[in-house]
Amino acid sequence: MNLNNVYNFKNPVKHFLNIDNLEFPSNITEYPIDNLTWTEPIKFRIYKEKDKYRTLKMPNILNFVAAYYHYKNLPEFEDIQSSDWVHKRLVANVDTGDFASGQYDLQLEGDFNCLCIYDNLIRLDIKEYYGRIYTHNLDFSNQEERYLTNMNTGATNGLLMGNYLSLYFAEEYLSKISHSLENKFIENEIECDFSYFSDDFYFFCNKKDNEEVVRIFDEVLESYNLERSDKKRIWTYESFNNYNLVARYWKKLVAHCNMRFKSEKTNNKLYFINQMVYRMSNLDDDKLKRVFINNVFKIRYFRELPLEKFQVKEYDYHQLCFLMNFSPEAMLYSVDRFAEMKAFKKEKLHHFFKVRYRECLKKNYNEEQLYYFYAISIFGYSDIIEENKGLVAKSNNQILISYYLRDNLFGQEEINFLKNLTDEEYWFQNYHLILYSSELMNDIEASIENFLIPKTVVLSQCNKQSKSNKREEYMKFYKTNLENEKAIIREIPFVKEVISEYLELKMKESEKMFEDSDKWGE
């Protein structure tokens, strides 16, 4: 098991972390709950839509790994969909740390089939679902609940967003909601096929039943102390068909570009970049456009394209910059290939990265800041990295700050600023602050006490032996890893390698899915 995949499920930030590199207690697979205390997660902000962001919360690593081993044998733990095969759309793959490839296309076909049968599709979702789950209502199968709540300062109201454990419990709870909905539709004699992806529900029904379907959804949610968000979309076959163009577009793009490519030539044009800009302009919303851009760079066509047989025109540079600016995540899957391309003049992108990185650091999107840092590192723009150290120090991006600490990029002014951030919520960057400071390492136990020990068991709070024992466990964990120079972040060349391995797994998974679907159709 790759612990990074469960610590940050789905989010690409997992590629930058190396939790498996850390040394854990020898009894971590059966770690006593009495060795753990309430801990505070770090906040990591990711882009949601327009000017909004969502906050992921990454739990204390010792607490999380202990919880993972405690819960990993629960029913359907690595096969979430099996808890509700009929209605659940979400298929998780812990080997890739992502949702299974190919499922979207299969489910889309099912949606169109339903829209041939029913008048419309109503899409509804649950308001602030993760934040409103009461942990006492979850089924722990007689396992200890505190492994979960200890990761979130002991809170029983709400789950941390971003890790696989929270996903598992949230999906198990959704299975119960789904069962209640099914019974209500049968009880009220309403013809309705429904499915759900996380807290996003798809109801296929006839127009005359629309209001009743929404009413039942509200009623069921209320019985679970939840409520529906204000967002509501109704689709017909025609409107749904016009909206869902992403898969068709990238397939057309590949077919079009393959026809233009001549293997005997060394001056082929990068038509696919122009085609991406053209095709995305026909998509309805920004989310679909970002999915389209990311998917093109993730598929085998681009990853194995013989770029040495292409020339780069001036317009290719500004179109590529446009795509990366629109979807910064795409940089993770593309810049390594362009950096290795002989005809690609990386100096053409220097000003773009100089301006965009600085602007990104002034905003709230931590993951995009990390993507820019990765691309700038791959292209070797060290001047851009260094000149933004002041903004990085105050960015609240603990992962990015840790990279700057590793590379000794901060001056004394920034270091002094960071040393004042002693609250527990800064434990991730403070771990690296100690690791890369000879001064703090020379007095390692005092440094751990000051920057890393959970606030519930700092020395001043240890008025009981049980608290002293807990404090000692965290002290040993941090001290062992710091003394053995174990960073939680990966070196950028290894990030590049891990991303390549992830993409290869995703491509193979997708290819197998379509091979299997072809067999089913025979």
Language model segments and positions:
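Conserved pre-motif C helix in the palm subdomain of viral-like polymerases
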Residues: 53-83, 127-130, 157-183
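Catalytic micro-motifs at enzyme active sites that drive phosphoryl/nucleotidyl and oxygen chemistry
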Residues: 106-113, 183-193
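Glycine- and acidic
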Residues: 49-53, 154-164, 195-202, 275-278
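Catalytic palm active-site di-aspartate
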Residues: 125, 162, 166, 186-207
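Conserved short beta-strand edge segments in small beta-sheet-based binding/regulatory domains
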Residues: 224-236
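Catalytic palm subdomain of template-directed nucleic-acid polymerases
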Residues: 133, 137-138, 142, 195-197, ...
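Short, conserved secondary-structure transition motifs
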Residues: 160, 164, 203, 233-251
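Right-hand nucleic-acid polymerase module
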Residues: 1-56, 65, 69-73, 97-100, ...
